[in-house]
Every structure is written in C-alpha cells, then in structure tokens.
Curated annotation (Swiss-Prot):
Binds 1 zinc ion. One of its GO terms (biological process) is rRNA processing. It holds the Pfam family YbeY. It comes from the Bacteria. This is Endoribonuclease YbeY. The gene is ybeY. GO terms for cellular component: cytoplasm. InterPro entries: MetalPrtase_cat_dom_sf_prd, YbeY, YbeY_CS. It comes from Nocardioides sp. (strain ATCC BAA-499 / JS614). Single strand-specific metallo-endoribonuclease involved in late-stage 70S ribosome quality control and in maturation of the 3' terminus of the 16S rRNA.
C-alpha cells in the first residue's frame, strides 16, 4: 500500500504510527495491497476553507474525506480492486480539543479520526441511524483491534 502523510499543521504528528494504523485498517477492510492513500494534516484556517468549499459548512472541522476511485471493502472470496482510495485531511488542533473533551488526548483522537476518515473513503456514512450504528460499530472494532495488538 502506498500511504503518503503530509504534515502542514504546525502540530507534531507521529507519521510512522499514523501510516501503520492506516495500513492496519486497510488490511482489515481487505483493501487492495496496491491501493493509495494520502493523509494531510493542516491548520484550522485551511480546514475551515476546505470545509466551506467542499461541504458548504462554515468553520473548521476535524476530518474531511475525499474518495477517488470509489473503492469498497473487499469480500472474503473476492480479489479487491486496485486504485486510489483517496485523500484525508485532518486538523490536529481540532483533534486536540475534541480529545481533551473526550478525555483521551490528541493522539487517540487523531487515530479515531483516521479510522473514521478511511471508513468514509470506503463508502461508509452516518447520516441515517442504521448507517451510524454500522459505521461507528466498525470504527470501534477497528480501534480496539489496533490498540490490542
């Protein structure tokens, strides 16, 4: 898997751990081994501008997901499709505030947002109650497996 991580946020970021987490999630979701993912960490003004431009929402957000080739999780008996999974844009400053509020710190929040974003890239959503249960249940499972290894 090709995982590119760019940190333009001014906030320290454990790039190796983030790449390992991304690889772990993509493996668990049976994404093709040659799939590509780019994660970019940005500051609040940058993510606020992207949020306004692409989501038509004012203000900063924690993570934005931009799928490319509409890859989906692989099935047990099928070969997954090759392609570009897409781009994630994270804001560590927003993650720091959310992590503090949740009581688990910035790094844990960035991990959560990374898993959340990858699931969005794979077509998961949480607009409807059933989708919310499925996506957040899977997110919790993946994070628990990552932290238990």
């Amino acid at each position: 898997m090709s995982i590119e991580i760019l940190n333009e946020s001014g906030h320290p970021l454990d790039v190796k751990r983030l790449a390992a987490l991304s690889r772990f999630v993509m493996d668990r979701m049976r994404v093709h081994p040659l799939a590509e993912l780019c994660i970019k960490a940005v500051d609040e003004p940058t993510i606020a501008q992207l949020n306004e431009q692409w989501m038509e929402k004012a203000g900063p957000t924690d993570v934005l997901a931009f799928p490319m080739d509409e890859l989906r999780p692989g099935l047990v008996d099928e070969d997954p499709e090759e392609g570009v999974l897409g781009d994630l844009v994270l804001c560590p400053d927003v993650a720091a505030r959310q992590g503090e509020t949740a009581g688990h710190g910035t790094e844990a929040e960035i991990e959560l947002l990374t898993v959340h974003g990858i699931l969005h890239l794979l077509g998961y959503d949480h607009a409807e109650p059933e989708e919310h249960r499925e996506m957040f249940g899977l997110q919790d499972e993946l994070l628990a497996a990552w932290r238990a290894r």
